[in-house]
Amino acid sequence: MAIIKLRGVLVDILVEMAPDFYKSYATTDKKGVKQLLVQCQNALYGTMVASLLYYRKFTKSLTEIGFDLNPYDPCVANKMIEGKQMTICFHVDDCKLSHRTPKVMDKMIKWLRQEYESIFKDGSGEMTVSRGKVHTYLGMTLDYTVRGQVKITMIGYVDEILTAFDKADPKGRGTKTSAAPENLFKIDEDCEKLPPNKAVEFHNLVAKTLSATKRATPDTYTAIAFLTTRERTPQKDDWTKLVHLMKYLRGTRTLPLILSANGSGILKWWVDASFA
């Protein structure tokens, strides 16, 4: 059982959607902010409380069968099985498992089905399993075809960003060889602000690109780091800088992030600095 407190605009939305159901339960706190208390019999998917409850349950299940949580990443668990390490990386209920022995993987998958698979009346809820060298995980394509390295791409997701951008700015075609213009950090305080509808498009495109930046396109970090600071009151200059970034994404949509390790303990990073 969980208690969820909804506040502000979200309460207004719920009351507007179903006034007969929610209106009588909506109250205000001491500061005059609208609030709505909801008691859930089960964790409600999509809320912070639900994610936390599931995390506690899942990590408890793993530690009970001998897994240790990684001290540097609480969403990674390890266990030595038959002399080899099994690693489970998880994002809520999306898990990535690895072990040298296929039979060990079979047993772990069977355990996960027994503990967490729930088949609903409509037949949905079945746990899906992908095995092999190439996987789709959290929007990323993880390619382990080359021994000792992983190639990460998000081509489909980047295409979605570019499709949304083309609708917002049909004239923004073409490509760029750098992710950011030379005047990226220059702000003209007198520049005209974007109209509300354009500001929403700016916010959506920046947010979508940020997700790709964190996972597969770190070469866009500098540009997206600046643009995220401009979301509250974006100007036309900011849109021009976003257009530059979108053109770079179009030209590098298939460029992979390649990670590998050789045991030296030395971190090396190769970048194209021709535009620096």
Segments (PLM) and residue ranges:
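Long, low-complexity, charge-biased intrinsically disordered regions
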Residues: M1-A276
